[in-house]
C-alpha cells in the first residue's frame, strides 16, 4: 500500500496541506500529516494535530509532500533532518512534491539542479538552481511542484494520478471540471 507524508511545520499554508490530505484520503491513499510538533499552527492560525511527529526518518513512505506558506516553508528548508530525507528520497527514486514557497526546501537539498519546477510568484528569486516554469503543476521525473493556494486541487489530483488513484473520478465527484474547466 502506498503511503504519503505531508509535512507540517509551524506557519504552513492550510489550503495547500489540507487539500492534499483530503484528496489523497478520498482516493483511499494512506496519507499522514507529519508535524515537526504534535500540534501545528498554520499561517492563518488554524491549529492541526499531526498524525505523527517527525523524528528524522520517513523511509516507510513512498512520497513526501511539502506544503508552502510562510514561515512554514522556511522551517522546512532549515530542518537538516528533513533535508537529509529529501536527499534520501531522491537517491532512492521516490516521489517528492512541493507547492507554493516549499520548493525552497528542495533547492536547499540540491534537488532542483537541471529540473523544471514552479512555485509561488517571486519565490523563484530565492532559487538559484533549476528552470522556473510558470505553470499550474510541473512534473519533472519523480518531482512535482505547483504554484500556490488556488492550484492546490490540481496539485492534489496530479498526486493521486501518480499514485495510481482515480483522479478523474475525484474530479467528477468533487465538481472540479464543472467549476474550473467550463470553457475547455
Locations of regions flagged by a protein language model:
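Extended, subdomain-level signal for the structured scaffold at the beginning of enzyme domains
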Residues: 1-92, 96, 105-108, 113-114, ...
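Short, thiol/selenol-centered motifs that function as redox-active sites or metal-ligating centers
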Residues: 99-100
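Anionic-ligand binding patches
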Residues: 117
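Short, acidic/turn-prone active-site loops that include or flank metal/cofactor-
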Residues: 121-125
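Short aromatic-centered micro-motifs
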Residues: 137
Amino acid at each position: 500500500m502506498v503511503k504519503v507524508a505531508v509535512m507540517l511545520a509551524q506557519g504552513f499554508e492550510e489550503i495547500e496541506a489540507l487539500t492534499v490530505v483530503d484528496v489523497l484520503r478520498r482516493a483511499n491513499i494512506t496519507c499522514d500529516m507529519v508535524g515537526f510538533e504534535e500540534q501545528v499552527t498554520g499561517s492563518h492560525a488554524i491549529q492541526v494535530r499531526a498524525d505523527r511527529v517527525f523524528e528524522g526518518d520517513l523511509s516507510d513512505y513512498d512520497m513526501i509532500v511539502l506544503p508552502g506558506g510562510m514561515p512554514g516553508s522556511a522551517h522546512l528548508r532549515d530542518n537538516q533532518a528533513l533535508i537529509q530525507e529529501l536527499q534520501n528520497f531522491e537517491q532512492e527514486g521516490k516521489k517528492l512534491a512541493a507547492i507554493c514557497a516549499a520548493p525552497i526546501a528542495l533547492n536547499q537539498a540540491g534537488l532542483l539542479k537541471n529540473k523544471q519546477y514552479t512555485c509561488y510568484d517571486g519565490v523563484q528569486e530565492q532559487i538559484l538552481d533549476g528552470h522556473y516554469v510558470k505553470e499550474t503543476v510541473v512534473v519533472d521525473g519523480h518531482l512535482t511542484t505547483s504554484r500556490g493556494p488556488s492550484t492546490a486541487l490540481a496539485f492534489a489530483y496530479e498526486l493521486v494520478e501518480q499514485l495510481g488513484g482515480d483522479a478523474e473520478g475525484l474530479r467528477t465527484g468533487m465538481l472540479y471540471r464543472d467549476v474550473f474547466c467550463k470553457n475547455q
